[in-house]
Amino acid sequence: MSTYTIPNVIAQHPRGGERITDIYSHLLAERIVYLGTPIDSGVANALIAQLLHLESESPDQEINFYINCEGGDLPSMLAVYDTMQHIGAPVHTTCVGQAIAVGAVLLAGGAPGQRAMLPHARVVLHQPAARGQGPIPDLILQADELVRMRSEIEAILSRHTGRSPEQLREDTDRDRVFTATAALEYGLIDTVLSPRG
């Protein structure tokens, strides 16, 4: 686990003077949401709160969601995904580093025509994994839930990529790594961003 300091930015206040805020608050004021960690329930709650806040401020204005995610908890990701699909504001998604597993679902779930990757970013699709702890009846329940959730993820990705659930199942039996160009061809994104300038 890395430790780092969250940077502060200095912004000019409209009535004169300066205001110091953390970088995430500054980005939020610009309608930018950034996911830079694996997803757990705490991260999901923060993302959902930001999406709901931005939608309440301006329900028709786009939200830019930047993703650099190593994966995470499926139910937590589904809560964020469902919120993205529920709100009226279109969510433009951009992968800036990697979108692994649950991060890939969020990337693909962006507004149609508004899903992008930087040229050296990558997407990894793979099947969900179980924890495998507890008594046998609990393990059976976990396995059943895993099968159900895998089907849900395949249906979601099918809806956003145009690929069949059967093809997605076959393609995710093992880790499948996509470059930006390969993700575009597969239907996970709509564009590969070019360097500015």
From Swiss-Prot:
<feature type="active site">
    <location>
        <position position="126"/>
    </location>
</feature>
<dbReference type="InterPro" id="IPR029045">
    <property type="entry name" value="ClpP/crotonase-like_dom_sf"/>
</dbReference>
<dbReference type="Pfam" id="PF00574">
    <property type="entry name" value="CLP_protease"/>
</dbReference>
<dbReference type="InterPro" id="IPR001907">
    <property type="entry name" value="ClpP"/>
</dbReference>
<dbReference type="GO" id="GO:0009368">
    <property type="term" value="C:endopeptidase Clp complex"/>
</dbReference>
<dbReference type="InterPro" id="IPR023562">
    <property type="entry name" value="ClpP/TepA"/>
</dbReference>
<dbReference type="GO" id="GO:0006515">
    <property type="term" value="P:protein quality control for misfolded or incompletely synthesized proteins"/>
</dbReference>
<keyword id="KW-0963">Cytoplasm</keyword>
<comment type="subunit">
    <text>Fourteen ClpP subunits assemble into 2 heptameric rings which stack back to back to give a disk-like structure with a central cavity, resembling the structure of eukaryotic proteasomes.</text>
</comment>
<keyword id="KW-0378">Hydrolase</keyword>
<dbReference type="GO" id="GO:0005737">
    <property type="term" value="C:cytoplasm"/>
</dbReference>
<comment type="function">
    <text>Cleaves peptides in various proteins in a process that requires ATP hydrolysis. Has a chymotrypsin-like activity. Plays a major role in the degradation of misfolded proteins.</text>
</comment>
<keyword id="KW-0645">Protease</keyword>
<dbReference type="GO" id="GO:0004176">
    <property type="term" value="F:ATP-dependent peptidase activity"/>
</dbReference>
<comment type="similarity">
    <text>Belongs to the peptidase S14 family.</text>
</comment>
<protein>
    <recommendedName>
        <fullName>ATP-dependent Clp protease proteolytic subunit 1</fullName>
        <ecNumber>3.4.21.92</ecNumber>
    </recommendedName>
</protein>
<dbReference type="GO" id="GO:0004252">
    <property type="term" value="F:serine-type endopeptidase activity"/>
</dbReference>
<dbReference type="GO" id="GO:0051117">
    <property type="term" value="F:ATPase binding"/>
</dbReference>
<keyword id="KW-0720">Serine protease</keyword>
